[in-house]
Amino acid sequence: MVLTLGESWPVLVGKRFLSLSAAEGNEGGQDNWDLERVAEWPWLSGTIRAVSHTDVTKKDLKVCVEFDGESWRKRRWIDVYSLQRKAFLVEHNLVLAERKSPEVPEQVIQWPAIMYKSLLDKAGLGAITSVRFLGDQQSVFVSKDLLKPIQDVNSLRLSLTDNQTVSKEFQALIVKHLDESHLLQGDKNLVGSEVKIYSLDPSTQWFSATVVHGNPSSKTLQVNCEEIPALKIVDPALIHVEVVHDNFVTCGNSTRTGAVKRKSSENNGSSVSKQAKSCSEASPSMCPVQSVPTTVFKEILLGCTAATPSSKDPRQQNTPQAANSPPNIGAKLPQGCHKQNLPEELSSCLNTKPEVPRTKPDVCKEGLLSSKSSQVGAGDLKILSEPKGSCIQPKTNTDQESRLESAPQPVTGLPKECLPAKTSSKAELDIATTPELQKHLEHAASTSDDLSDKPEVKAGVTSLNSCAEKKVEPSHLGSQSQNLKETSVKVDNESCCTRSSNKTQTPPARKSVLTDPDKVRKLQQSGEAFVQDDSCVNIVAQLPKCRECRLDSLRKDKDQQKDSPVFCRFFHFRRLQFNKHGVLRVEGFLTPNKYDSEAIGLWLPLTKNVVGTDLDTAKYILANIGDHFCQMVISEKEAMSTIEPHRQVAWKRAVKGVREMCDVCDTTIFNLHWVCPRCGFGVCVDCYRMKRKNCQQGAAYKTFSWIRCVKSQIHEPENLMPTQIIPGKALYDVGDIVHSVRAKWGIKANCPCSNRQFKLFSKPALKEDLKQTSLSGEKPTLGTMVQQSSPVLEPVAVCGEAASKPASSVKPTCPTSTSPLNWLADLTSGNVNKENKEKQLTMPILKNEIKCLPPLPPLNKPSTVLHTFNSTILTPVSNNNSGFLRNLLNSSTAKTENGLKNTPKILDDIFASLVQNKTSSDSSKRPQGLTIKPSILGFDTPHYWLCDNRLLCLQDPNNKSNWNVFRECWKQGQPVMVSGVHHKLNTELWKPESFRKEFGEQEVDLVNCRTNEIITGATVGDFWDGFEDVPNRLKNDKEKEPMVLKLKDWPPGEDFRDMMPSRFDDLMANIPLPEYTRRDGKLNLASRLPNYFVRPDLGPKMYNAYGLITPEDRKYGTTNLHLDVSDAANVMVYVGIPKGQCEQEEEVLRTIQDGDSDELTIKRFIEGKEKPGALWHIYAAKDTEKIREFLKKVSEEQGQDNPADHDPIHDQSWYLDRSLRKRLYQEYGVQGWAIVQFLGDVVFIPAGAPHQVHNLYSCIKVAEDFVSPEHVKHCFWLTQEFRYLSQTHTNHEDKLQVKNVIYHAVKDAVAMLKASESSLGKP
């Protein structure tokens, strides 16, 4: 991986430079400059603090610089392209350069260095450039041929650990790049962050401000500055801005800033408090300011009488305010005020696309980086360095701080012991009367039976309380908590967040018990424990604070602190108590039996809460994902069984609008996890197991790094507290209900707990009873299986008497010699089976076998592969709603001599082989697909077949029977296409002219599809001007040829509905298969997630790009090979055929033919005169591992490295051209679907299916994601894969919450079936 932004120039502000002028050297010009003595030339060095404009190619470019060795007061503006200036070099990227070894001078080694790039070269440098080796202050000159790009960042980190100075600087470079990336993007996650803005006022160098809004469209920040109140908008590309960090903390084998994993519903899954960015080292000295006209910053620096040079760039003059940019609410400063702002960050030389890091720990000590535990891990790219001699403390970057009034409040009822006086609401009473809740409410323990009563817990909390004892007066407590928003016990059925606005409805205020002097007095007299109902910062200062509250309390501006307690990790979790002296202290934590009706009602199948589904849908969902749910429950039970009997399990109730995430791997926490009782640090089961296993074996835990506790103490696994989110035994109760309902409705169960004799869902005793259910007598579950070479675990289903025999004695149940079905053994078991209700086989011998529990194979040999918690639910399982023949086939498996299991034979593939027009046993021929004929399925749905009868194409997007036919192919993991949608859409809304008119002035990033280089400083109008006009396109610098561009992340993030409401409505009203694709679709499992939770962002998202028409362009992709965690429907809403390009049709036809398209597709283009937009290549999800192995093989052949935390598919670094596709088919037998997407076509891509896109003409595509019951298994696999990606991958964070989605989908399906039992006479 090369840490650079390609060949494009990033921003100049904050970068080091070298300048050479004729006035400072020999007279006579370039001829007198001797390259042999280039190091002796009179170079001047320094730092760029501001620029006149962002276009570095314009000859009027001026930069404000501070020269090394001079005071910052002597800063000045210089003309980069002046006549006297002979060279101007700026820091560009990180490379490896040869140098003599510091230890062994006669040895030449490769050393990381920052390379300078020539912005101006009139001195004849040519191939000579300057580099500065990390750890050195001086620059040297070397030939560019001696420089090598850095391919393996992780190996480099490990090699630098012995040199603390170099290691720290290397770490600081990465962090500063992350800072710069978010500042330049106008990232909304910076809201609430404190920043330093460079000032051109002679009296000060910097001034402080707080970010109150980020505008990704205009890439500007709206700030609140006390020193200059009129300053509202800042452009970090023009003036130096730094994010202020007050603290660094060392995390295991790397250093990271503290990360807040609580998610706000206000921005649908983005971090409420993202990782703080590091500030640069003490700024170098600088020089006097020359007065410059104010036209440079214009509206970008409102109210500032800028001291910067004028700009001749027409874009910088009189630019109207971009759409959706913050309102201009600042008045100009009075005359005489010359405060200004510029950034100071070191060069952003790094090319990792950063994900916004999150604020993590709050404390650090000197010397942490020198410890062995601080060595950099192979999978972690977020490395921070500790500045010398200081301990800086981070400020939280919170989304909610600028929206205090709209912060989501927890709509939760407080447990009974929370208030001394009894309180109840009508909603609580209504819920309590629900029959499903009666037995749960009867088991709710008394207030005296809690975690604090156990001696083990009290011993652990004593140290926490020793420093917190302080006499508390009621009035004092009341004043401290006066800003607390009251929580509501009323069940709120409204969404936490609507996409049409960024506001959330604040529930009616309810004050903390500590604000009521009478209640406080009663609590002091009785000594009764109560639940913390306010944030830590509003309680007594001496009590231990959680990580969020600790960071929040460090903010200098108290007005900007969060006033909502929901982001406190101890809110509605920790128990407090007044001792006999009236001192408030920590008493313990809630336990699973302390729930109330509202808390338990969120997790139980309550019939009155089920909307938007029907009986058939509920049966179908349960048949498809019921087994996955069972595996999930088994995994939770296994994890619970590993907890020592004497350990207490705490209960952390779900908080509305907050998503609990693992502080280590960013995975959404479903239920069981481990929490630090001192700071609230939380880790998932997988990370806990991995850490504990490594600690026991004495190995370094390098996969993920753990942040530190208060006072830099290490989080040891044995000191963490097991905690569950689902109250009581609700999880196991729902598991029992699932089996009961499936039995009553005849829904087949193929999960390991199908045989009830093993009682896998026997509910473990709650830990507050200090009892642990023994697991003796239970058969091994899927959690004991060891992964094979493939990350996908394949099930072995052996039924009947074979279940009791050793696995080695199992005989193949079907012949392997001449059967025409033997080819099915080569298929993976990942496909969901298709229903077969038409044929019922009478096989009494097999009837009992079908219902047996498939035993698990023993471990053939000790495995070194760590088996993770999630892997127990990654095993593909068959569809339960199937006929006897399918169950027979799924239950009949064979073992090879070496103990490996053959894949089950799948009924759907048998059908596929029987209905083909022609069959052949020749493996070299293309496999034919399943041709679903209306006469066979009983449907009358217009459709035809593409890709040699392997791709279903539905012709009527509004046909009510589409989803029935669609489902038959979708089950098998096949993509599907629907045509004719453009006839339903409002075409005027999707034309380029409408986008240009509405958004033309917005500033965006563009990507050159041929080079993947990022082009900054362009506008939306620049892109649309060349959309259908080749001569009017932006041209590259070298050949001055029109570039093939695509809009990068536009509209940004989740802004599609807000920016384009009419287009959103038009799309949602006409998108085909609304049962799957609409947000409220009955087969879209994401719709089952209650509004109580943070909803995942599933789009829509736009993809706008020019076409790649020339023969040379066939090796490039508009979107390289990648895969997505969710299903997607991609709609071609507009195809633009550009002017000024000859022989377009001939080249497009050749590209279609070269792309392996079939004859019918070519006929659509030639005879049907349809507009082809894009060429897709989609591969089956089951072939992902083969494709990954192939790409790694090719990269090794090309001399490229394969870092452990990177992936050739997830990196999106490959496009498979014809030669690579041919090799993939010949060497690995992998063939995909070559699909040409015409205007109005909708391509449905299954979750986990690798795919790539090559635009034939200029295209506007819109994609909507969804979660279908047929492909949930791929979501599991991908979520586990993404945990191991580097922190800079956009897919690293688990935003889908697949476990929560499955749980609530099953819960609602069960509720619907139970509600229908009485009407259908079910007992």
Curated annotation (Swiss-Prot):
Residues annotated as domain JmjC: 1060-1283
Tissue expression, as annotated, is: Highly expressed in testis (at protein level). Also expressed at high levels in tissues responsive to sympathetic nerve activity such as brown adipose tissue and skeletal muscle.
Q: Which cofactor does it need?
A: Fe(2+)
The answer to whether the entry has keyword Glycosyltransferase is: no
Q: Which residue ranges are recorded for the region named Disordered?
A: 255-287, 307-337, 385-416, 468-487, 495-517
Question: Where is the protein situated, by its record's location annotation?
Answer: Cytoplasm; Nucleus
Report the EC code(s) recorded for this entry: 1.14.11.65
Reactions catalysed, semicolon-separated, are:
N(6),N(6)-dimethyl-L-lysyl(9)-[histone H3] + 2 2-oxoglutarate + 2 O2 = L-lysyl(9)-[histone H3] + 2 formaldehyde + 2 succinate + 2 CO2
* Residue positions of motif LXXLL motif: 885-889
Asked whether the UniProt record includes Disulfide bond among its keywords, one would answer: no
Q: In the record's cofactor note, how is the cofactor described as bound?
A: Binds 1 Fe(2+) ion per subunit.
Task: List modified residues, type Phosphoserine.
Answer: S264, S325, S446
Comp. bias regions, Polar residues? 266-283, 307-327, 477-486, 495-507
State the deletion phenotype: Spermatogenesis defects and adult obesity.
User: Which EC class heads this enzyme's classification?
Assistant: oxidoreductase
Induction, per UniProt: By beta-adrenergic stimulation (at protein level).
Q: What is its main location?
A: cytoplasm
Provide this UniProt record's keywords sorted from A to Z: Acetylation, Activator, Chromatin regulator, Cytoplasm, Differentiation, Dioxygenase, Iron, Metal-binding, Nucleus, Oxidoreductase, Phosphoprotein, Spermatogenesis, Transcription, Transcription regulation, Zinc, Zinc-finger
| Binding locations of Fe cation | H1122, D1124, H1251
Q: Where are the zinc fingers (C6-type)?
A: 662-687
This entry carries the following GO cellular component terms, namely: cytoplasm; male germ cell nucleus; nucleoplasm; nucleus
Q: Gene3D superfamilies under this entry?
A: Cupin (2.60.120.650)
Entry function: Histone demethylase that specifically demethylates 'Lys-9' of histone H3, thereby playing a central role in histone code. Preferentially demethylates mono- and dimethylated H3 'Lys-9' residue, with a preference for dimethylated residue, while it has weak or no activity on trimethylated H3 'Lys-9'. Demethylation of Lys residue generates formaldehyde and succinate. Involved in hormone-dependent transcriptional activation, by participating in recruitment to androgen-receptor target genes, resulting in H3 'Lys-9' demethylation and transcriptional activation.
In which family does this protein belong, per the annotation?
Answer: Belongs to the JHDM2 histone demethylase family.
Present the record's domain note: The JmjC domain and the C6-type zinc-finger are required for the demethylation activity. Leu-Xaa-Xaa-Leu-Leu (LXXLL) motifs are known to mediate the association with nuclear receptors.
Q: Write the protein's name.
A: Lysine-specific demethylase 3A
User: What organism does the UniProt record list as the source?
Assistant: Mus musculus (Mouse)
